[in-house]
Amino acid sequence: MEVKYLDRTEIDRNAWNECVKSGSLNWVYAYFEYLDGVCYEQWGALVAFEGTKYAGVFPLPFRKKWGHIHYVYQPNFCQQLGVFGDFDTLSLEGYSTASFLKLIPQRFLRVHLSLHPFLGDVLGSKKKANFVIPAGFGPEKFNKDARKNLKNLSSVVYRETSDIWAVLKIYDEAWGRENMFTWANTYEGFEQSLILLDSEYYYAFNAFCDEEIIGAAVFLVSGDRLHYVCGGPTNKGREMGVVHGFIEHVCLKFPTHKIDLEGSSIPSVAQFYKKFNPEEEHFLRFEQNLRLWR
């Protein structure tokens, strides 16, 4: 097995997606089309080859400073990256997340990534909480406060939508000031990623109360897991606690799927997610000057 760095234009899209979809971790975050959107087509990758077959892939979104200094970063609306492919095969060949990190080309002077933990820990990384509701959970397993809020939402109706721009507008009005996102540098890329994807890989919906929209959300559909990637209430929705309804709705609509709430380093958000009695997983936050680390 040989690992090479490829620029985006050198990557075989079909071979890439086949590697991700048939691998141990079939997450939409790593699909070629999704990366193209959220990275604005500026990314490369480490690819492990078995002959001509892609056996493992490690996407590397990058930006440039002052026109020539390259650095790897974590895109918005893309919680975890890392190595994707057949983990058993990669492990047998002696590969891990840590070994892939050592192969990142030296021209990337800084690497800041959030990594999934399923191909080994990384020395020097920090473990971050990630909250996942197990498949089959319903509102009867939520805590008392969550169930109380859901009673106030009994008249709310949820309808699927293809208008991603409208969902993002609600999200921006709810959280944009805190996140400091901009349309040109953040939202347009995410919207484009969903346009490029087949609709089976995401679920977007609006929440209505008396035919008034009170919130909207987008979940990515990754095999048996949904990722809560984007959601926000209107002012009325905030008063009603409609985000509780988002979680209940997808738990009931997708009973065979885990619901990945994606954790939060903000204590109030983490406490909110704990209302739904999720299991706590973790991901790895890796921040290093690559030249020093090597």
List each model region and its residues.
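A conserved beta-strand-loop-helix scaffold within acyl/acetyltransferase catalytic domains
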Residues: E2-G51, L60-G67, H116-G237, K275
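N-terminal cap/recognition module
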Residues: G56, P61-W66, H70-G82
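Short amphipathic alpha-helical segments
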Residues: Q79-L81, A129, S154-S155, H257
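Short, high-confidence coil segments that cap the C-terminus of an alpha-helix
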Residues: E41-W43, Q106-R110, Y202, T256
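Aromatic (often tryptophan-rich) hydrophobic motifs at membrane interfaces
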Residues: E50, Y54-V57, C78, Y95-A98, ...
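Short histidine-centered catalytic/ligand-binding loop motif
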Residues: N76-S91, G176-M180, G232-E239
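A gly/proline- and charged-residue-enriched helix-loop-helix capping module
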Residues: Q74-H116
